[in-house]
Amino acid sequence: MSTIRTDEHDDLRTTVRAFLARYAPAHDVRIWDESGTYPENLFREIARLGWYDVVTGDDTADETAGLLITLCEEIGRASSDLVALFNLNLSGLRDLHRWGTPEQRETYAAPVLAGAARLSIAVSEPDVGSDAASVTTRAERSADGWIVNGQKTYCEGAGLPGAVMELVARVGGGGRKRDQLAVFLVPVDHPGVEVRRMPALGRNISGIYEVFLRDVALPATALLGAPGQGWQILKERLVLERIMISSGFLGSVAAVIDLTVHYANEREQFGKALSAYQGVTLPLAEMFVRLDAARCAVRRSADRFDAGLPCEVESTMAKYLSGQLYAESSALAMQIQGAYGYVRDHALPMHHSDGIIARVVAGPPSVQLDFIARSMGLGASR
């Protein structure tokens, strides 16, 4: 395995940057974030270019993750929220490819690949977060399918037009709690489903939603995989998801550093540029070093994924490093740029609010460190 990028990755990076300059310029991204607008044309063009096709092949025999981290890092330079939407579609398409029937792929994957639909996931509940095995939303068998009742929270992108949720519900059965879960494919406009947008500090482009399910009648064909396979689907999904969102965070960190370096070189105080003061330059240099180290961690996890090797620990470490770094670098940038970085016609407010949630998505730091500790053989709590 090698963490050295190839000419193919460099060409892809150049292509993505040119694409984003046309379809997601900085001014437009700020407007989308401020107004909570979903850029439908952007994601239609992403679908047209075939970027989703990366996950519809045999991802154990190619450079699936290696290509995706390049895509996600470049998109992350524009917005980590755009990466979140990209990831939702990619992860959902991969789930459909690995677990879905031909009918499900035709019904749910084909519209996404055509840019006409979106995918989301619904796991968290008012009283259930990191402990996904404890979900209380229930799916009970009916004569011709399933009846679902429950509530989901913090579902990104679930209220977007044409969205389909991968809904995690309890189907019963014996054994451990995690063995009683299943995943259902549920269009958000299905009878009995109510979706409400939750006012949030960040992630305004994708939107964060709560979902109410009242006697939702689903056909048997809505079940993804088999009853009891929900935990396995989630576990597999989360590995590549962490790799993708980590690379997106690093793209955002790189953008924040670039903005702040430019500001420090241009802004003068007491007769000198801010970049002449070590109180400014040394913290920025440390962030740059941490960015390079975190990028190595992401690339290592991607290499292991593409080699078919276990990478749960590696992807968790990558997510821990990148999430912490995005939160801390955006806060540092706000401090250095002062009032200039606080006003809304600047990209920093978006990065700062999205950087805060970067610590939490795909597992908060405490849960990640607990998992890493147990992988070391320590008797960590849980």
Regions found by a protein language model. Give the residues of each.
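N-terminal glycine-rich flavin-associated loop
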Residues: 83-103, 129-132
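Alpha-helical interface subdomain recognition
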Residues: 1-78, 99-104, 111, 115, ...
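A structural signal for short hydrophobic beta-strand segments in well-ordered beta-sheet cores
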Residues: 137-140
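A short, Trp-centered hydrophobic/proline-enriched beta-strand micro-motif
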Residues: 115-123, 167-168
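A short core secondary-structure module
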Residues: 149-194
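Flexible, small-/acidic-enriched active-site or ligand-binding loops
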Residues: 134, 189-219
